[in-house]
Design a protein with these regions (language model features):
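Glycan-recognition and catalytic cores of secretory/periplasmic carbohydrate-active enzymes
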Residues: 1-124
């Protein structure tokens, strides 16, 4: 469904457009390329063809992925697969994401250990 930028759309048309884009493009890309089934969490440093360019796991991305999957379950279709996919991300955040004083780490290494700011390299 392609629209010209000058075309006026009804709300239900916009909603359908974005639902289709989410479910036919974004989620399949994420599910195929970004979930870390071995260690939990979400690989957010991938290029447009899905190639992993860094294994660093940024906590804000973990939270975003957790929210998206939970929201799909709670607000979209109630499919239990969304909770199954969200659970390892939640587990990573709960088990590895916090400092001893309760703050959140900025990012984690592939093994779940905290990434030191001095070890961070640009992925661009």
């Amino acid at each position: 469904m392609n629209y010209k930028t000058t075309e006026r759309l009804e709300f239900h048309e916009l909603l359908q457009y974005f639902e289709n884009h989410l479910m036919q493009q974004i989620m399949p890309f994420w599910l195929e390329n970004c979930l870390d089934h071995e260690r939990g969490g979400f690989n957010n440093c991938v290029n447009d063809d899905g190639r992993l360019i860094s294994t660093e796991k940024f906590l804000w991305s973990q939270g975003r992925a957790l929210w998206m999957l939970s929201s799909l379950y709670n607000d979209f279709d109630g499919d239990p697969k969304w909770l199954e996919l969200a659970t390892p991300i939640a587990r990573l955040l709960i088990d590895k994401g916090r400092t001893p004083n309760g703050d959140w780490f900025f990012s984690l290494n592939v093994d779940g250990s905290p990434k030191k700011a001095s070890d961070r390299k640009s992925v661009v």
